[in-house]
Amino acid sequence: MAQTRFSRVAAGVLILAAVQVGGAAPARAEAPPVAYVGLKYDLVRHGLDKGYVFRTFDDPRSQFLPDVVRKIAFLRKESPDIYAKFLTPAVAAQGRAYLAAHQATLNRAATQFGVAPEVIVAILTVESGLGNNAGKYPVFNVFASLAVMDSPEIIQDLDLDAVGRDRLKKKAAWARRELQVFLEYCAAHRLDPFSYCGSWAGAMGFCQFLPSSLKSCGVSANGKGPVDLFTHDDAIFSIACYLHKSGFQRQNRASWRRAVYGYNHSDAYVDTVITLAEWY
């Protein structure tokens, strides 16, 4: 029997863990699906230059990542246990050392946006190990792959019920929006879209921002831009901006939880970040 696109996926797909973005090897690639043709024209219809879009997809670095699609298709609810590794004396010591090393930048960001430096560092700790683990998946390839996962050639090979198929269609629409924003940003600033790597879900930089978050909350610490989320200064300022826009008030501890929850809709994540901030 002929193998389908996903029957060729290697067994033993990695267990998902959003906080372990760099621990896995990049997903293997396959030939681009036919659905990429429609995706390219969709991006052009929404305002991107046709030549730019076609050149990007025709680049030899452009690859379809079936493993990433499968991860999203069969996404499991995270276990609170995945955050236990952060609540240790060693991690707390690393956070305090980071606070001391980046004190000037943290204080400037905290003053400008009215947030707590300790919360910024706690988020950086969980998201990327203070910048040491930002992910290895090419961001363009992730979003391009996810953007077509609702196409018949792909979805038919996934054994999903009606609820699963509906969720996949919503995630594909989300990925198309994120891809549009990502390419718009790269084109506007003349950045190589293949130079960005991140998590299997497309989050990038030390702060693990999605392209839409980069657009709305990305801040250049020196005010010159473009924003580089793979630098400590810009990641710190961008997190501070995100928390501020999420309602963070330094003197209102209840607002801390609400703002951090806006960063990641997980009670266990919020508990971990707040606990680390208190330890710092």
Where are these regions (language model features)?
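Catalytic glycan-binding domains that act on GlcNAc-containing polysaccharides
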Residues: 48-280
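Sec/Tat signal peptide C-region and signal peptidase I cleavage site
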Residues: 23-29
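Bacterial N-terminal signal peptides
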Residues: 10-20
